[in-house]
Amino acid sequence: RLLDTRFKLGMFDSPEKSKWGHLGKKDVDSKEHRALAREVAQKSIVLLKNKDGLLPLKDKFKKILVMGPVAANVNALLGNYNGLNSHLVTMLEGIIGKTEDKADISIDYVMGVGMYGESKQRGWTLGQAENADVVVACFGLDNAMEGEEGESVETIKGDRETIELPKWQLDYLQAAKERGTPIVLVLTGGSAIAFPREIADAILMVWYQGEEGGNAVADVIFGDAIPEGHLPVTFPKSTEDLPDFADYSMKNRTYRYIEK
């Protein structure tokens, strides 16, 4: 199959015969390709919850707090085996870009908690959630936390042993929720993540969004794009709900897509 694909791509043809031979550096990272990357990212986003029509935010809220270890993290835009990119747009950058021409809307940002462990800054950063009109909480996994081989040397990295959202992230989210401000949870990852649905008022599963991810997420949050995605995998409530890994009977499991 690998060789078949290479033949179809014309990799064994002479440049003058290959229909791809005319492509060069000018065709890499073009405006058209970035626009396509943004569109694909938009359409992959899954809306899991939207209590009281919190989304889209549009211009309903004037003080927006962006928080979480994923918000300014380019690694949370990329899956494993990714290539190099000239420019990656983080979620924080996308949200700022969406509102920078609106003088009456302010954006604050706190990481709040670490990607791979507890943060000592947790206490004082939570106060900002209380003072905001709405919180956009960017949490989840990055390509190292679901990595393979070399990344698995560090204990936090490599294959996941549980499907739960990391405890330190969940604890911080819970503390932020107790402040009473509406929360839009933006989750990154490439597999099922278990978490309590009541942790946020609106929930978007955005996966690994790619180079235009921050812009695509901001488009959906502010209503310039519709989250059209569907879950390709089941999200169990907890690791305990999963059958034993050595059980190959496939009872109560199916390859079929179920609407409800």
Question: Which residue ranges define each predicted feature?
Answer:
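Long, well-ordered, tryptophan-enriched scaffold segments
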Residues: 1-16
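C-terminal non-catalytic regions of proteins with extracellular/luminal or membrane-system context
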Residues: 4, 23, 27, 35-260
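Short, conserved phosphate-binding/catalytic loop or strand-edge motifs used
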Residues: 19-21
